Design a protein with these regions (language model features):
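Conserved phosphate-binding catalytic cores of ATP/NTP-utilizing and phosphoryl-transfer enzymes
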Residues: 1-2, 115-147, 237-247, 307
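Active-site nucleophile and cofactor-binding loops and adjacent substrate-binding regions
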Residues: 119-128, 151-152, 299-304, 395
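Glycine-rich phosphate-binding loop and adjoining helix at the ATP-binding site
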Residues: 94-130, 276-287
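Short beta-strand segments
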Residues: 11, 91, 150-151, 258-260, ...
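Short acidic, glycine/serine/threonine-rich loops at helix termini
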Residues: 21-22, 31, 100-104, 129-133, ...
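Short beta-strand-loop/turn "lid" adjacent to the catalytic site in phosphate-handling enzymes
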Residues: 56, 75-108, 256-272
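Helical "lid/coupling" subdomains associated with nucleotide-phosphate turnover
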Residues: 21, 46-72, 180-450
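Gly/Thr-rich phosphate-binding beta-strand-loop-beta motif of the actin/hexokinase/Hsp70
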Residues: 1-37, 136-174, 448-450
Length: 450
């Protein structure tokens, strides 16, 4: 028995905007009389939009109206109605997520993503999505090799170190193809603030490839430091993206470097330096000539589309099948996660008092709990929440806990208990209507840079 979910991935980046429509096949992987175990078994891409330049009113403001028209047109071309989309992700990435009107863009696009809306991708989430979408995670799992994936976009480079098919750590550097822009004659039109002290060019200067190359070399050196191929200097910290943790340089002796993002296409083939009106072509060729490509390296199976495929196909999870829900107004969108250090009514009250609206309480739970353990948890949660309980567990006990809460809070209370979903502090959840016995869930990290 299988179900089909229609999914959309929309990536609004510093340089480009693109969409992917895909179908996710959901199947029960359990056998016989076992508890149902629902998994996303297959991902089929049904439509790819062209890659568009992200519409901007100026260097600081995304044109939300033009972006909405672009998205509506792609839905029309794909032959897909908004109401037929079940799941997916709108990801605002790179420098675009720090534009002053990022929230307005989200508002303008929110009704295009079916039952799911993902806001801005923090550096960690964007790195994970890019590594998965580019095939770097699959490559590591298939070959057993350790991979450092670099998704080099317009404003930032998202890093992910992958060992045996598992992402160990992530990072983000202010290295990208649109940090320096030119008109058709080579006159500088924009210099990103992150290049302060690193670039001798300023808007209005007439530039040549020879003047641009040193800037590309500096950016490439930061990537080499992250890969452990160059001795670390303060440059690495200087170019670390605000909001991203420090990425300790790799120490692996055998490391495959994988590339995706718009600049990755410029690594593979040499293009005229003003092809895109930015530093991208020169940066790509500088990387190609650097230590990053001196050993084993590979271009992702998807380069410029890596993040959006990750959003459309990899952000959706399914809860366990023994869930409990009562009077829940599905879909729930952008509900903050509060990780509990202990399950006491005092802690629950204190943590919920910090929230402006509803929050999902997350804790590991107990493996194969007895009746008394479940009852004790339910007593504390019922007393702490005061009538509305949204719970996320790692252990398979959501149904038992939900039933115990319903006995204490009554038939009119809003109760949601899901399990088999791993979250962390600072995450947000979207929870959709039931698919068979499980619930579709999107775990998100929302960070709007200042």
């Amino acid at each position: 028995m299988s179900d089909i979910l229609r999914s959309v991935g929309l990536d609004v980046g510093t340089t480009s905007t693109q969409m992917i429509f895909s179908e996710l096949t959901v199947e029960n992987k359990a056998s016989g009389f076992a508890v149902p175990e629902m998994e996303i078994a297959r991902r089929d891409i049904r439509y790819r939009s062209p890659v568009y330049f992200t519409p901007l009113l100026d260097e600081s403001h995304v044109d939300a109206g033009a972006l909405r028209e672009l998205v509506a047109e792609e839905y029309r071309k794909a032959g897909i109605r908004r109401e037929s989309v079940d799941t997916g992700a709108i990801i605002i990435t790179g420098e675009t997520s720090r534009k002053e009107n990022a929230r307005a863009v989200l508002d303008a696009l929110s009704d295009f993503a079916g039952e799911f809306v993902v806001a801005t991708a923090g550096p960690d989430l964007e790195s994970v999505l890019a590594a998965k979408g580019a095939g770097a995670v699959d490559y590591s799992q298939r070959t057993g090799k350790t991979v450092l994936h670099m998704d080099i976009g317009g404003g930032t480079s998202n890093l992910a170190l992958i060992r045996d098919g598992k992402i160990e750590r992530t990072g983000c550097l202010n290295v990208g193809g649109r940090l320096l822009k030119f008109d058709g004659g080579g006159t500088v039109t924009y210099v990103s603030p992150v290049l302060t002290g690193l670039c001798g060019l300023k808007p209005g200067d007439k530039a040549s490839p020879g003047q641009v190359k040193p800037v590309a070399e500096i950016l490439t050196q930061a990537l080499e430091m992250a890969a452990g191929l160059r001795e670390e200097t303060p440059l690495l910290e200087q170019l670390t993206t605000r909001g991203a943790g420090r990425f300790d340089p790799c120490r692996e002796k055998e490391l495959v470097i994988s590339f995706s993002g718009g600049v990755a296409d410029c690594i593979e083939k040499e293009l005229p330096w003003l092809e895109f009106g930015d530093i991208g072509p020169i940066l790509g060729q500088t990387i190609r000539e650097s230590r990053l490509c001196g050993g084993e390296f590979t271009l992702g199976s998807e380069t410029i589309r890596a993040t959006v495929i990750g959003a459309g196909c990899h952000s959706a999870q399914l809860s366990g099948s023994t869930v409990f829900h009562q009077n829940v107004p599905f879909p729930l969108k952008n509900v903050p996660v509060v990780s509990l250090a202990d399950i006491s009514r005092e802690t629950i009250r204190r943590e919920l008092s910090k929230q402006e609206d509803s929050a999902i309480l997350a804790f590991p739970g107990v493996n194969s709990p007895g009746y008394r353990e479940v009852a004790a948890m339910a007593e504390e949660i019922a007393a702490g929440t005061g009538g509305k309980a949204l719970i996320c567990l790692e252990q398979d006990m959501a149904k038992a806990l939900g039933q115990a809460l319903a006995l204490r809070l009554g038939p009119n209370a809003e109760i949601l208990c899901i399990d088999r979903v791993k979250v962390s502090e600072g995450s947000y959840l979207d929870v959709g209507a039931p698919v068979g016995p499980a619930l579709p869930v999107v775990v998100k990290t929302l960070v709007l840079g200042k």
